[in-house]
Amino acid sequence: DAITKKDSVTLAIVSSLKKSVGIDDPDIEINVEKGVVFISISDKLLFKSGSYIVTEKAKTVLEKVAKVISDKPDFEAMIEGHTDSKSFSNGVLLDNWDLSVKRSTSIIRELQKLGVNPSQLIAAGRSSYVPLVDNETAENRAKNRRTRVVVMPKIDQFYDMIEKEMKQLSGE
């Protein structure tokens, strides 16, 4: 019953997030699977090309993302930076690994400024190794350049949820 309530709260948050950012915005995708919220944001909404400095436009979206995370103090949010497969280097950043991690930490700093508890945040860079689509065209490369926010139960709570579900399934 508690999980059902949590799920309905999560769904309410997600639908309000979709409404506030504009459900038809192709640069933002929001999904909920088994109590985990996935928010994927195109890099063109967050950063200028090759940069890890968060744009002013992004801050409105990040305010809403911060609310989703702050409303779930028992959850963690992993911020994953993703790039396309084009080699990248600009003197400061060595490659796509650097760019993906720097983008993740830039988003984390913004979320922290917006009041999210830093102990809930995890920085992750995926470079170009988890593409949504192949990197053959400019359009596809643009789809692969994104930041994904994964809001999930803390690992010990996650195991507790699984254990409870297993007990329910076995009729204990």
Feature-to-residue mapping (PLM):
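Extracellular/lumenal/periplasmic "stalk" regions immediately C-terminal to a signal peptide or transmembrane helix
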Residues: 1-31
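A broad detector of the eukaryotic-type serine/threonine protein kinase catalytic domain
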Residues: 4, 44-46
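Short Gly/Ser/Thr- and Asp/Glu-enriched loop/turn motifs at secondary-structure junctions
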Residues: 32-36
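Short, aliphatic-rich beta-strand segments
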Residues: 37-43
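Periplasmic OmpA-like peptidoglycan-binding domain that tethers envelope proteins to the cell wall
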Residues: 46-64, 68, 72, 82-171
